[in-house]
Structure formats: structure tokens, C-alpha cells
Amino acid sequence: MKKFKPIIRCVIFLAGLAAIMGVIDFACVQTGYVNYILRNVCAKDNGTDYDTVVIGASHARASSDPEQIDKNAGTYSINMAIPGETVKDSYYVLEETCRTNDIKTVILDIDYQYYFNPPKEGFYTEQFIQCQMDWRSYVKWQYIYDNMERMEIRNVFTRRQACTFTPSNMKDNIEQKLSKGYKEADIYSLDVDGGTYAGRGYFYIKPVSGELAG
């Protein structure tokens, strides 16, 4: 029995640490579009099976309307472009989309900015998409392994960039994660400045008026 005591203590310590991290994650880590769209594309209880996917960053999210694509191409598409998404992110977002959908066509948004000044790998915010993937997804674990080769291990598993510890923000986080909109990954429930979500990942930017309109 003495031989197993150190092991038992380690297990208890790790379990306690996981519980503490779970509470912090629930109360302090903000969530939003990335979490919702990843859950939407993987949901199978709504009878959807996309055959076309748009991959890119913010420009693609606001310029590629799945409804218009389907109308002209006879497809059933989803826009998985995510603001801040890198080329490496696109690879894993595509793999995650293919995990639960029979994708036949990929529309890849090519913007010179993606390649002209690509971000250096290893920065602590790099895993902002990886951290929002489902723990049951093998793609998430592939992504974790990839990031561990370049990042400090604590940054791989924690969402430092999304943490907030002010009482008001923690209250908002908890209310959001207990809401029906969050549980159902309802993108339309998100309040976003500058535009509205118009369906299947497409973000409609409101027309600019006044001096900024040019």
C-alpha cells in the first residue's frame, strides 16, 4: 500500500488542479464566435452535412455568403473563416470540418497579407482556435502536439489571452455560459459591433455612413 500512496497523492493533486482550472475556465475565460462556429460545424443533430467550406480570415468571413454560393453552385456550404486565422489554423479548421462532414469543395481565400507578414509561431495567443475545439476531437490533439513543438506547454493548454478577473466580466461570462444561446451554440445570440451574423458563418458588415463612407 505504501508504494501506491505517492501515486494516489499525484492523482488527487492532478484531479484537484483540473477541477480548479475548470472553475477558472468557466468563470473567467471569455467565449464567443470561434467556440460557436466550431460547435455548429460539428453538430450532427440538426441533420446538416456540409459539402463545401470557405476557409480564410476576417475578409473571407465578411465576403463569402454561403447562401449566395449555394444559389449559384448548387452546394450546401458553410463559412469557417475566423478573424486572426493563420494558414496553419486553416489546415486544422479544415480538418475539423472534414471530421464530421463530407467536404467535396474547399474555397480558400488567398489574401497577400496572410503571406506578406505572417505571425511568428510560438506566441502565446497562437492557440486561440485550438483551445476552442472539442476535447473529444482527435484534430484538437493533433493541433496540441503541433503547438507543443513551438510553445511553452502552459500556453498550449491555457487561454491566457481570453481571461478576465473583474467581477462584472466574470458575471457576464457565467451568465453567457448558462444561457440557452450558448448551450445551443446560437451565433445569432452574439452581440457584435459593426455587423450581424447572417447565417452559416457569414458576417454581414453594416454599411458605413458619414465621413468614413468616402
What are these regions (language model features)?
Residues T125-G214:
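Secreted/periplasmic serine-hydrolase-like ester/acetyl group-modifying domain
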Residues K5-F26:
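Hydrophobic membrane-insertion alpha-helices, especially the h-region
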Residues M1-K2:
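N-terminal hydrophobic targeting signals that begin at the initiator methionine
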Residues M21-T31, Y76-G84, F203-A213:
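Acidic/glycine-enriched edge-of-secondary-structure segments
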Residues A15-L17, N40-D45, P66-K71:
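Short amphipathic alpha-helical segments, especially helix-boundary/capping motifs
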Residues I55, H59-D146:
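Membrane-embedded segments
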Residues C28-D49:
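Alpha-helical transmembrane signal-anchor/signal-peptide segments
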